[in-house]
């Protein structure tokens, strides 16, 4: 068992640890991995699979609802929406009230990170220096603690890995929405 808290980010897949949720990133770390894949043509129309390849979520920008991207569970029930206006608006059912995307992922003064407020707690999405397309999520006051989540682009796919602490804090849906916003190619400010 590794004592390096960052070693799990590069490890293989593990077994299922939360029943209906996908398997973890590694058996010992408990990390949960989701893969945004099957882009049609991009992250605004894609499938989000667990590490076992099973679809868990769907992201769709349907022509019948122009200007909207909807995030759905595997059973088809929507849980999140992005309304693409000049200043995009987001909402996550029962957890994030309707607000501007620029409020949900607030750009820092130095423009090096984005603050995400969820359940009255503040988190920071921080791009990693010298690591192209890797963004870590930390609690705002955490300093050097291991990241709660990581977004990494790998080829055409986008990987989202969450720690057990992130899952327990209810960050799965806000993190899924963050991936779509950050990789949409659209201005969110």
Protein language model annotation of sequence segments:
Residues 1-46, 51, 55, 110-113, ...:
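Low-complexity or membrane-interfacial segments used for flexible interactions
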Residues 39-126:
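Acidic, polar low-complexity intrinsically disordered regions
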């Amino acid at each position: 068992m590794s004592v390096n808290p960052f070693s799990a980010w590069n490890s293989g897949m593990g077994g299922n640890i939360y029943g209906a949720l996908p398997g973890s990133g590694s058996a010992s770390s408990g990390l949960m991995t989701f893969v945004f894949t099957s882009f049609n043509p991009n992250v605004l129309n894609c499938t989000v699979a667990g590490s076992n390849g099973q679809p868990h979520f769907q992201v769709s920008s349907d022509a019948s609802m122009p200007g909207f991207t909807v995030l759905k569970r595997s059973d088809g029930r929507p849980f999140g929406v992005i309304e693409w206006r000049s200043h995009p608006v987001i909402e996550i059912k029962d957890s994030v009230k309707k607000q501007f995307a620029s409020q949900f992922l607030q750009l820092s003064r130095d423009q090096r990170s984005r603050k995400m407020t969820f359940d009255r707690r503040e988190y920071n999405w921080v791009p990693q220096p010298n690591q192209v397309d890797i963004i870590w999520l930390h609690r705002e006051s955490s300093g050097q603690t291991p990241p709660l989540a990581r977004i990494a682009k790998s080829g055409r796919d986008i990987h989202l890995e969450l720690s057990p602490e992130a899952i327990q804090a209810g960050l799965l849906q806000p993190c899924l929405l963050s991936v779509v916003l950050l990789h949409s190619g659209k201005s969110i400010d």
